[in-house]
Amino acid sequence: MTSTFMGLETARRALSAQQAALSTTANNVANANTDGYTRQRVSLEATDYFPAVSKNAEKTAGQMGTGVQGKSVERIRDIFLDYQYRLQNNSAGYYDTKAKALSQMEGVLNETDDSGLNSVLNSFWNSLQELSNNTNEESARSVVARKGQAVAETFNYISESLTNVQSNLKAELNTTVLDVNSLLSQLNSLNKQIAQVEPVGLLPNGLYDQRDLLIDKLSSMVDIKVSYNKSGGNALASAEGTVSIEILDKNKQSLGTVLDGKNYEVSELAANYDNETGLVSSISIGDTAVQAESFSSKGSLLGFIESYGYITADGQEKGVYPEMLSDLDNMALEFAKAFNEVHRNGVTKSGEQGGDFFDFTGGETEPAKGAAGKIKVADSIIDSKGANIAFSLTGAANDNANATKLANVLTGKITINGKETSVLDYYAGLIGELGIEAQEANRLASNTETQLNDADINRQQMSAVSLDEEMTNMIQFQHAYNAAARMVTLQDELLDKVINGMGVGGR
């Protein structure tokens, strides 16, 4: 038969189990607004039945339950939902970075008002047209000089501003690399702590939450693959183990392991820059250098690399800002060369041969390099307030032929970057391509943000604390606790009857 005190022990176990459930519920409520917290529950299981199976087991009507015990405190989390969230978070990090970089470029070019380069070029063209109609007007020549100076200064401003934004992108790129390394270091520390807790049969849920939050942040910067390494000892089956993390390329192939969860090692990232151009040449993962053009791991880091600029294995400069700066440099160079050639063939009002209207200094091997930032109107034109403008071909007072040719430089065909086009059309093409690219980046950023929010909602429905649900659970566990307490009282009354109310005859 069962022990006299078996019912008391069964009730005690019930009290202990329901108390653990209530404590877990209280912890859920307390952390309802804690970032990264995953709701928890006590996994309850029935204790062994009595009597145990054996040849000498006591003959009873059947095995009797002996109560309940808390097996573990587990998180309510779905690894597939984590994967979906991090996948969208990765895309969002990449497209958001590209969209912001393109938006900053649009802000610099400023083609929505009258201060943009297109408007300034048109004003310059109009001043040349006015000069061709009024060759004897000193004011017309002075206006051409000022408008030409405005063109040069606008080129200078755009080049300088784009270079400044590019420098800011480099700083953000370096900060992102530091952030990645910091997250990896923190994850490695958590791995070590988890490896100490799990083998003794406990689940470090708080450490799991911290780790998942850090992995979420890391996923926005680089594309990662997370794998789990089971702990030894007496680890529970539900123990997650330590994590190892690999960086993936666009084809989901590994570029290298950055966190080794078995050996607790971190391979830090480093951005390497080309000495000549200053652009990204490679990304180091530990001791392995990956060429910048081959580093295709999506995320904000790649967004910064593609925006700031990188150099290919054959020396080509690629990226949003280097390519725009190169296009503007080539445009400024070819425009100035064509304009100067026409101006040199003309004659000033005083009958002197025209010289260069624009001055610029380029490199010997790459004359276009930095041309947009260096172009200026020749000092002779500025100092004479336009008197030295060669508007004529013959020197005759009413000869406006060269002024007309100068105006045609802006609208006529010249070769820029191997294309037969006009200066105005070439720049309009640059702005059009930028607008399309920025619009597409904004669209993708918006779409991925929506998908990220949907993935987050799905995950929150599974893992977030619902106060309504916790209140319901609290009432359920409270009633169970009260019933167990009542069972203790009942057992006490039964024992009192046995001890104090039986066998009193003959006293």
Swiss-Prot record:
Name this polypeptide is given: Flagellar hook-associated protein 1
Coiled-coil blocks: none
Species for this entry: Bacillus subtilis (strain 168)
Top-level taxon: Bacteria
Any GO MF annotation of the entry: structural molecule activity
Record keyword Cell inner membrane present: no
Listed GO biological process terms: bacterial-type flagellum assembly
Subcellular location: Secreted; Bacterial flagellum
Family statement: Belongs to the flagella basal body rod proteins family.
Matching InterPro entries: Flag_bb_rod_N, Flagellar_basal_body_rod_CS, Flg_bb/hook_C_dom, FlgK, FlgK_helical
Record bears the keyword Transcription: no
GO CC term, one of those recorded: extracellular region
Any Pfam family hit: FlgK_D1
